[in-house]
Amino acid sequence: ADIILNAELVPGIGGGICQVSTTLYNAALLSDLEIVSRVNHSLPISYVPLGRDATVSYGAIDLKIRNNTDRHVLLKARVDKDTVTFKVFGDLPRDMAIGIETQVLETIEPGVIEQVDAKSPPGSRTTVQTGASGYLVAVWRVVKSGGVEIRRELISRDRYKPQPSIVKAGPSPQAVVIP
C-alpha cells in the first residue's frame, strides 16, 4: 500500500498500517478514552472524514491512548481479509451517547508549479498533476446523557497540506518582428 513521503503518495513498507491506527483512534474517541498522543496525516486521506485519521511511523510517530476512566476497559481487535475491527468493552452509563463532530475551518487552495520543458512545443501547457486543496479542521467529542449535551471537548485542530498542480510548459514562443 502507499505511504505519504514528502507530501506525495508512494509505494512503501508499512502502507496501510495507518488504517489500523485510525480505526483504533476512532474506537477510542467513541469510547470516551483519553487521546494522549495522535498525529494526523499531512494530506487528506479517503477512508475517514477529515480530522478522524491517526498516522503512525515506526520509531517516530505513535498513537497513544489512556484509560482515564475509573472503569475497566477491554480492547478487542479482529482482522478478517481486508477489514479491521476494534471493539471496546466497558461500563458506560446506559443513557450516555458519544459522538464526533468535525468542522472545516479553512480551505487552503493549491498553488501551481510550472516546469519549463524545452522538448515540449513552444507555448504548450500540459497538466502533469492536478492539485488538491488543503484544510484546517477542528474535531470535537460530544457527550450526551439522556439526549442532553453534557460535554463538548475540542480534540484537535488538524492541518492538511494542499497539493499543488504541476504544469509542464513549453518554452515561450519566439516573438516575431514584422518590419
Which positions does each model-derived feature cover?
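Well-ordered beta-sheet/strand-loop patches within structured domains
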Residues: 1-179
